[in-house]
Amino acid sequence: MDYDTIIGLEIHAELKTKSKMFCSCNNDAQGKEPNTTVCPICMAHPGTLPVPNKQAIEWTILIGLALNCKINELSKFDRKNYFYPDLPKGYQISQYDLPIAYDGFLEVDDKPVLITRIHLEEDTGKLIHPVGKKHSLVDYNRAGTPLVELVTEPVISDAKTAKKFAQSYQQILRFLNISNADMEKGELRCEANISVQEKNKWKYTNGQILPVGKYKLNPKVELKNINSFKYLEKAIDYEVKRQIKALKDGEKLVQETRGWNNGKGITFSQRFKETSADYRYFPEPDIPPLKISQKWIDEIKCHMSELPAQKTKRFMEEYFFTDKEAEILAGDKDLAKFTEQVMCELHSWISASGDTFERQKHKLAKATANWLINELFKHLKAKGKSAARIYPVKSGEAGILPKAKLFDRVKITPENFAEFITLVYQDKINSSAAQTILAQMIKKGGDPTNIMAELGLEQLDDQAALEKIIAEVILKNQKQVAEYKAGKTNVLQFLVGQTMAATGGKANPKVVIEILKNLLDK
């Protein structure tokens, strides 16, 4: 029996506003002593009243616009009632039937993943479980942090697409500069709702999974406790296989919440899954409904920066990067800015040399992408300063996308990197010398031309000087010369290597090969 996989995502993202959602407490609780960024409002003292954070509302509208959503003209906050120690009020201020944004989509691999809603709520506190103790502690510093929840339609059919969607959403949040969206710090939390249904026994209509005929739908399972994109994909894959195996073994599935165990690579049951009725939603009586005018929406739209997908497309059209190169270089806000600054500086360098930038732009962009993706990041990885994600660039190659803010910690400026690319492009240094210079630039910064001069790495391409050196190489390697003349042409590389060694690696390989062929073919 064959099954279809049905996946919907719920993604929570903390907004990095200066103050919390409904009070004036500092919203940055990272590294703070427990329960020090709290006040009577976020601790739910009797008689206190919440005041909504305008910036959090505007940023939620901005997310909605970035994800092609409709914005509700009338929105409101609701009370979500449940008891848990990390919830000081005994309820959470959230949104139920009138979210700020709804009915949107985000393209993944050129296919739209539909978005049901994007709503705004307050975060809870954090439970701490001391090792070896029989009690738990609670830190309310996080309570009241603005939290945006995105809910997709159940239209995702595989774990890889779910992971790509979450990664793309993280990119957008960072490009908009409204959330750090760091999963390791809990600033971005992904939950997956998963069910498996027999093929041709169900249909998707108006946002609902419905049975065909007398078929009884299998229940969905919610996955929690997932702290990385890698584990999101693994957890979904495992859970799909678990459910299919259970059904084939004649077991009955239940609607439940399951956690993910990174160490064991399995999901485990936590509790039976609640329904919306269990939360007894009702309108928040202390906060009036939100009226969102078109004028307000238009003002917010004016502040929306270029998004990753748009920047990727522009990089391909403007600089002739390949789709994979553009995806990598435009995939991080700081890296994209660095790349554009380098291309701008290259325009100045090439124009100053008397050449035409437009004529050389394609080749310069290729060199820039190669040295950024395949060389600079390789050096940084070796120094332990990178490695967030690995993308294939060409067959057999990989580019490493650095973590956010990487270029704040690297001493290379766009101006110096553009000068470095110019030296390579104009054959003033060979590949070996370029690697040495780049390593020095990463370590100490500085002008690549000065580094080249200090280390004596300028490429030797003087015809007369090289002919003299190559003549000596030929004289000392008569056996290889005879092999070459007998038709064993790959020996030429040996002779090139001998010449490079004789010049301390400074010779221009192209000129060396040309001279060798001229002398050997006489």
Description of each model-found segment:
Residues 140-145, 157, 183-190, 199-203, ...:
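C-terminal non-catalytic interaction appendages of large macromolecular assemblies
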Residues 387-392, 407-418, 428-501:
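Strongly charged, low-complexity linkers/loops
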